[in-house]
Amino acid sequence: MAEVINGILIREVETKNIMTKSSLPVGGYSVNPYVGCTHACKYCYASFMKRFTGHKEEWGTFLDVKHWPEIKNPKKYAGQRVVIGSVTDGYNPQEEQFGNTRKLLEQLIGSDADILICTKSDLVVRDIALLKKLGRVTVSWSINTLDENFKNDMDSASSIERRIAAMKLVYEAGIRTVCFVSPVFPGITDFEAIFERVKDQCDLFWLENLNLRGGFKKTIMDYIAGKHPDLVPLYDEIYNKHNRSYFEALEVKAEKMAKKYDCAFVDNEMPYGRVPQGHPVIVDYFYHEEIRGTENTGKRNR
């Protein structure tokens, strides 16, 4: 069954198991209540999923609503990292209608899993009471700019101000929060300005560089040429000549920022926990391709 709702092609599909072993550096399980994502981010790495799902539609214009057998033994995932939204956003606008993410969270009550929710939405505040029942939960918002115009050029998700407001509400409810500054656009993303806005309402401040590969490399390079022509030489140096010195300099800047604000500075996420307000752990994920297998150690393989 398929129908078009507000310009999005919606299908309802059956899946045998909603829990999938993850190949992400954070390990554990990857759980995606939907196929596709209607935020239509221009830099989205998850657009590669079309190769496996058979979708011909443009990324961001379709959404498959999954139906799965109830999770009968949630305790099976005790102590495991469960990432919700690795290749979708569980709180996309359609979640308000279909409620798949809420259903998933209800099925994980009592699991004692270490749950990480990745989103660009403020809809997550709807489920604060439910998240508190789950215990070990972290909610991460992607915020890579304070400029709403640039944000609107890149995605159709909630405004930056709405994301920041949602983060504050979730943080004040006692739930661990992350500001995921991803992707850091060279010459555009001012991560210290973002830090100033969110440092009192997040436990982790996570930095990840912009990676350009596949079909969206041309999309972003064309955007830079059209909107930021002064940055073309820098992007050519980084993404065509593979010069990493820009991000090496940003890593140094981030470490200095950590010292300035008396924050821990690590190469990867530390084990679950809250930190003193105003002193979030700053996570250097500029070298995430080197981090695989180091989850919860705080150190990169060197």
Task: Please identify what each model-predicted range represents.
Residues 109, 171-172, 199, 259:
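Anion (oxyanion) recognition and catalysis
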Residues 133-139, 199-204:
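Glycine-enriched alpha-helix->loop->beta-strand junction motifs that scaffold or abut catalytic
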